[in-house]
Amino acid sequence: MSMFRTLQRQPRTISLFTHDLENSRPCLSILEYLKSHTTNRFDLELSTKFPTLDQVHYMNAINPMILRAQIPHLTKIMKLKSYDPLFGSQLSDCVTKGFWNKEAPLWVDWEKKALGTDLQSIKELLEKD
């Protein structure tokens, strides 16, 4: 897929999951960095909704430690059915219910199979490119 994407010169997608886009300093710093350092290399997808079950499984395969810190009840959540109301629900509600860590956003580079929760981790990823 990445060879095909390269041939088409399409940007790859980085998703940023956050419960509070406007007031989250870590989220805003990641956004500012991506806007100023990546030009047209990426499509940035901002999400204030809980990831799908498939996305949770994919992210868990990438880095279970980071994901477990972001989603406190990860083991329980991964056993839910894909149609459970949690998936796709507002992250602000998930914070209230204890299903999402309010301290940091979560970014995911789907193509490079990388994820993190802070500015430093995304800087390190982009420096490798």
From Swiss-Prot:
Taxonomic superkingdom? Eukaryota
- Active-site positions on this chain: 94
Q: Does the keyword Electron transport apply?
A: no
Q: Supply the Pfam families for this chain.
A: DUF1687
Transit peptide limits: 1-21
Keyword Transit peptide tagged:
yes
GO BP terms, alphabetized: negative regulation of transport
Naming one, the record's GO cellular component terms include: mitochondrion
Q: Please list the GO terms describing molecular function.
A: oxidoreductase activity
Name its cellular compartments.
Mitochondrion
Q: What is its EC number?
A: 1.-.-.-
Q: Into which family does the record put it?
A: Belongs to the FMP46 family.
What is the role of the protein in this entry? Answer: Putative mitochondrial redox protein which could be involved in the reduction of small toxic molecules.
The protein depicted here goes by the name: Putative redox protein FMP46, mitochondrial
> Source species, please?
Candida glabrata (strain ATCC 2001 / BCRC 20586 / JCM 3761 / NBRC 0622 / NRRL Y-65 / CBS 138) (Yeast)
Query: What gene name does this entry carry?
Result: FMP46
